[in-house]
């Protein structure tokens, strides 16, 4: 038993060290294959000897079952926010004031102000026992299970007293874009994604979203003879907490201010979003003397970067309808350059936003890039308001079908609920044929609009009857000739085999994006089973809360929708999970094998995966591992993957497998 216990301890220490170098230092020490083998060895030992599982084992980070809510706990010391400074003059005054009050020429530490979610960790006897959100500053929610899924955060530290460690949890730019691309309703910015993820009741979802963290504060540091902020940061590093590598220390006020101004210009190069820099007095000995207001400490201040604001004239408001019937208010603007991009429109969200901000046509408005991506109207420059401004009226009726718009309880958005609405149906058909859904190439929004207006395609069902309307289509000014029409029909026919997940995505059910659609397809296996699911059954599923469950339940209990499904099935559109009822090539050497694809091909990766899945019921890997059966190599494959495959004697094949 001692040999097994020692082996487990060695593996835990080894993997923790590899995790630290990979997730904190960004310096991987071994390749993925070696890491996976070590991890699997540890998993097997723990499976065989569950009584020897250690609390800080890397295997204990994976997400668990969903919880009903988070326990609220008091902070040992208040989690205050920082006072903001918007000019270097304010920073200079802050420094001068502290030097005067302390009668010293002090050092100041400059740290990044990460645009994320504040977190306070508590360790007792060296073990992480609580992870509290800021909450109202006095009371926070304990999101411990979610925080444990963040691999850069130590589950244990070599310190036996009770201690708090504070920092920020965030999502980097690349991860934010990748996750948002999978969501039907994307997050407005990375901070919202981090906040929503860390408070998700299902820690499995949190684990999938690759949250990151940086730490910077030990509230009771003086009790442990830590006397400066630089000592705090050094201690955190020794305990293997992730700490920012962009921290600077200054005694000269002018050098510090020059650094702030220079940093603003290079912040775009960072992999994560900042909304400023924090300037802290380095000496903790003066913290108690300086004290704090009810909201902010007096020994630190946040220098906020100048947002990318420009002013222009709002010339009109465009009101459109989305595929779910949601009403979108968009400001039409006089062309203006914003952060290197020509902007002629910006979102106004909804009418409540317009009313609250008192935004009018012909106003001069301030626009900015929210989350550095989407232009938004921030406010009106009232000093430039003239007598020709026109008050924007709330849209009462759908601009497309003239149906009365409705507001759903607890939502600020308006909706057109008429399922025969022209614009709503055009948007739905356009989404149905998109790559995210049924991936029917050859149809764009303009073509769909003309087909709709000529009564050739009025719903997604009509797409599958288009093959019988060749003469009518060719007569339209669509630049579609005989050859293109035949190719379009082939694409439509091929989409029938896409399976339940893509079909469910394309139906445009509110709150159901492609990721949730795949999960539902894997669970229910076919549309009929989903159709007959109870509300309680839906609520119990991962990724499905009450709001989403009600949306699904209501959609599948609408007679019109049931008829839609029936009509699709009559046209041989597959409503089962993809592998079911497919004539797989079961005698092939490729049947139910695992492939890795590398290099470029004449069709997309998604198309390759769809083709091979339909033929061989296969799976796919992103890295070369012993579990990979075949590597498919195209033009300019990744040499590292090819060499690794050769080392493992994995057969390397080409695109002949699907041609």
Swiss-Prot record:
Binding-site residues for NAD(+), renumbered to this chain: 32-36, 81-82, 111, 134, 168, 280, 304
Cofactor(s) recorded in Swiss-Prot or TrEMBL: Mg(2+); Mn(2+)
Catalytic residue positions: 113 (n6-amp-lysine intermediate)
Species of provenance: Mycoplasma genitalium (strain ATCC 33530 / DSM 19775 / NCTC 10195 / G37)
EC id: 6.5.1.2
Catalytic activity: NAD(+) + (deoxyribonucleotide)n-3'-hydroxyl + 5'-phospho-(deoxyribonucleotide)m = (deoxyribonucleotide)n+m + AMP + beta-nicotinamide D-nucleotide
An example Gene Ontology CC term for this record: cytosol
Record-annotated BRCT domain positions: 585-655
One Pfam family from the record: DNA_ligase_aden
Presence of keyword Metal-binding: yes
Leading EC class: ligase
Xref: InterPro entries: BRCT_dom, BRCT_dom_sf, DisA/LigA_HHH, DNA_ligase, DNA_ligase_AS, DNA_ligase_CS, DNAligase_adenylation, DNAligase_N
Gene name of this polypeptide: ligA
UniProt function note: DNA ligase that catalyzes the formation of phosphodiester linkages between 5'-phosphoryl and 3'-hydroxyl groups in double-stranded DNA using NAD as a coenzyme and as the energy source for the reaction. It is essential for DNA replication and repair of damaged DNA.
Keyword match DNA repair: yes
GO molecular function, one term: metal ion binding
Name of the protein: DNA ligase
Keywords associated with the record: DNA damage, DNA repair, DNA replication, Ligase, Magnesium, Manganese, Metal-binding, NAD, Zinc
The family this protein is said to belong to: Belongs to the NAD-dependent DNA ligase family. LigA subfamily.
GO BP terms, alphabetized: DNA repair; DNA replication
């Amino acid at each position: 038993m001692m040999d097994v216990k020692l082996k487990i301890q060695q593996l835990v220490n080894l993997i923790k060290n590899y995790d630290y170098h990979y997730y904190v230092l960004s310096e991987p020490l071994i390749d993925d294959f070696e890491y996976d083998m070590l991890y699997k060895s540890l998993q097997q030992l723990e499976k065989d000897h569950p009584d020897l599982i250690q609390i800080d084992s890397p295997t204990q980070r994976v997400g668990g079952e969903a919880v009903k809510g988070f326990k609220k706990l008091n902070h040992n010391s208040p989690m205050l926010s920082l006072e903001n400074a918007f000019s270097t003059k304010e920073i200079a005054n802050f420094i001068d004031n502290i030097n005067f009050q302390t009668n010293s020429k002090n050092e100041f530490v400059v740290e990044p102000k990460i645009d994320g979610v504040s977190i306070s960790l508590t360790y007792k006897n060296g073990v992480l026992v609580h992870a509290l959100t800021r909450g109202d500053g006095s009371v926070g929610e304990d999101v411990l299970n979610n925080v444990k899924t963040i691999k850069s955060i130590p589950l244990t530290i070599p310190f036996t007293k009770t201690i708090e460690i504070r920092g920020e949890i965030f999502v980097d730019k690349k991860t934010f874009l990748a996750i948002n691309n999978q969501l039907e309703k994307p997050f407005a910015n990375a901070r919202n994604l981090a906040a929503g993820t860390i408070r998700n009741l299902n820690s499995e979802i949190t684990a999938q979203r690759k949250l990151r963290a940086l730490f910077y504060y030990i509230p009771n540091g003086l009790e442990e003879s830590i006397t400066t902020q630089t000592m705090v940061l050094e201690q955190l590093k020794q305990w293997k907490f992730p700490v920012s590598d962009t921290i600077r220390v200054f005694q000269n006020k002018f050098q510090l201010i020059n650094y702030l101004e220079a940093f603003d210009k290079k912040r775009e190069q960072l992999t994560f979003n900042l909304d400023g820099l924090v300037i802290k007095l380095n000496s903790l000995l003066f913290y108690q003397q300086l004290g704090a207001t009810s909201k902010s400490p007096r020994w630190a201040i946040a220098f906020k970067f100048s947002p990318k604001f420009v002013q222009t004239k709002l010339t009109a408001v465009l009101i459109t309808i989305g595929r779910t019937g949601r009403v979108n208010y968009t400001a039409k603007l006089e062309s203006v350059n914003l952060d290197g991009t020509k902007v002629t429109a910006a979102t106004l969200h909804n009418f409540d936003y317009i009313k609250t901000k008192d935004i009018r046509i012909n106003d001069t408005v301030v626009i900015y890039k929210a989350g550095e991506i989407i232009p938004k109207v921030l406010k009106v420059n009232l000093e430039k308001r003239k007598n020709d401004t026109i008050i924007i009226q709330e849209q009462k009726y759908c601009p497309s079908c003239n149906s009365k718009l409705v507001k759903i309880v607890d939502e600020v958005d308006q909706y057109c609920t008429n399922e025969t609405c022209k614009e709503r149906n055009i948007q739905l058909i356009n989404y149905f044929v998109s790559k995210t859904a049924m991936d029917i190439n050859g149809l764009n929004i303009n073509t769909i609009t003309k087909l709709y207006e000529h009564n050739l395609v009025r719903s997604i069902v009509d797409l599958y009857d288009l093959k019988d309307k060749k003469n009518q289509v060719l007569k339209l000014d669509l630049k579609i000739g005989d050859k293109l029409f035949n190719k379009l029909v082939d694409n439509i026919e091929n989409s029938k085999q896409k399976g339940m997940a893509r079909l469910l995505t394309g139906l445009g059910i509110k709150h159901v994006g492609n990721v949730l659609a795949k999960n539902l397809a894997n669970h229910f296996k076919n549309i009929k089973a989903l159709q007959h699911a109870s509300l309680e059954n839906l609520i119990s599923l991962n990724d499905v809360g009450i709001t989403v469950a009600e949306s699904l339940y209501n959609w599948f209990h609408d007679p019109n929708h049931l008829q839609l499904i029936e009509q699709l099935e009559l046209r041989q559109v597959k409503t089962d999970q993809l592998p079911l009822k497919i004539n797989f090539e079961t005698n092939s050497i490729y049947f139910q094998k695992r492939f890795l694809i590398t290099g470029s091909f004449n069709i997309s990766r998604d198309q390759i995966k769809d083709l091979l899945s339909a033929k061989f019921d296969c799976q796919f890997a992103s890295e070369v591992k012993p579990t990979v059966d075949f590597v498919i190599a195209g033009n300019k494959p990744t040499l590292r993957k090819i060499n690794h495959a050769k080392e493992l004697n994995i057969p390397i094949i080409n695109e002949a497998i699907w041609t």
